[in-house]
Amino acid sequence: VCSPFRADTREQREKNLRAARAYMFYANKKMNMNAAAPHAYMPLLLCDEIPAERAIALRFGLEILEQSDVMLVCGNRLSNGMRGEIVKAALLRMPITVFDEGLYLEVQKLVTQNNGDKKSVKLDRENFPMAFTEPESYLENAALFK
């Protein structure tokens, strides 16, 4: 799961953590994927504000990515960290699924700029909650968490 983590405020960062957990949950329950979102839990162990600890967390996330079969780009914006993960996925020739139509061309462009194949980027309109910035609200209402 590739989604925003870093934020200007603690409240926004907490919102991003909840969203990452919801994306992971949705991918597991509705898409039958063993999805991983290391950034949803790493902040419990490492502090994003300490550069050395952030570097450890980023390396760990990239190592998890290397073991993955597909990247799921969630939400409706790309953070710098997400861009780095997408570049890594392109270098690995990994299939990438995007859920937000507005990000689709942006991700394709980023992939081709890094010698990847834009055909490896797929737009999935069926699993639209993965494009929401606050997916947990939708999922709670859909009774997925109950």
Regions found by a protein language model. Name each.
Residues 2-146:
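Conserved catalytic or regulatory cores that recognize and/or transform ribose-phosphate-containing ligands
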